């Protein structure tokens, strides 16, 4: 059994990131794994689609979380701490609480989280620390790298998330060889299990 932690999941509409988690949940079952999904409350999505349906037979838990830019701003402005490492950091607490309940009831053998969104890895990190379960951290894109994020404080917050990942995760996966090589060079002294799984 595997608990998938992902921001992008139906009924969200309009993001290519949906497909990776959706297909993981679909194909893991073909390899004998039973997946469940921990995601965010759909109110945090900018757009949803009634036609975007979760997989039948896959348990989905929606934890509280909001988009700081849309739901926590006043006249278009909001404090920076509400958006670090990203605008959905309010999902962390709800995700941890809901995730611990799912671990107790669903009893997964492994945790899996995917970036983007960085908060998904924060949830995965906390759940791995609290439960002792092995954790696989998936990177659809690199996090802190040259020129991204542009804001220096946000860049540092991304780097801190990375450091949490590579100090605790049992394995990491990447969509491209370039991203894998980038992180192997950065963290090879403390982390050995790098894998590439293309989209």
Predicted regions and their residues:
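N-terminal subdomain of nucleotide-sugar transferases
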Residues: 1-64, 171, 199
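Histidine-centered beta-alpha loop that forms part of the nucleotide-sugar donor binding/catalytic region
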Residues: 7, 115-116, 139-142, 198-199
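A short, histidine- and acid-enriched strand-loop-helix "catalytic/donor-clamping" loop
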Residues: 10-12, 100-101, 119, 133-153, ...
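A conserved catalytic-core segment of Leloir-type glycosyltransferases
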Residues: 37-103
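Donor nucleotide-sugar binding/catalytic pocket of nucleotide-sugar-dependent glycosyltransferases
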Residues: 39, 61, 134, 144, ...
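An aromatic- and histidine-rich active-site surface loop
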Residues: 45, 85-97, 108-131, 137-139
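Short acidic, glycine/proline-rich loop/turn micro-motifs
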Residues: 73-76, 106, 146-151
């Amino acid at each position: 059994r595997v608990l998938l932690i992902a921001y992008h999941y139906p009924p969200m509409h309009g993001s290519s990131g949906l497909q990776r988690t959706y297909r993981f949940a679909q194909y893991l079952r073909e390899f004998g794994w039973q997946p469940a999904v921990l995601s965010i409350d759909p109110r945090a999505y900018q757009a949803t689609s009634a036609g975007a349906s979760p997989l039948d037979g896959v348990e989905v838990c929606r934890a509280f979380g909001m988009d700081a830019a849309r739901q926590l701003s006043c006249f278009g402005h909001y404090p920076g701490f509400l958006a670090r490492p990203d605008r959905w950091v309010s999902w962390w607490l709800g995700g941890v609480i809901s995730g611990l309940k799912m671990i107790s009831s669903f009893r997964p053998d492994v945790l899996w989280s995917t970036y983007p969104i960085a908060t998904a890895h924060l949830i995965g990190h906390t759940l791995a620390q609290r439960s002792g379960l092995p954790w696989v951290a998936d990177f659809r894109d690199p996090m802190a790298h040259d020129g991204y994020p542009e804001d220096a404080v946000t860049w540092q917050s991304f780097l801190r998330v990375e450091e949490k990942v590579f100090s605790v995760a049992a394995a990491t996966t990447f969509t491209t060889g370039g991203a894998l090589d980038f992180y192997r060079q950065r963290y090879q002294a403390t982390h050995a299990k790098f894998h590439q799984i293309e989209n």
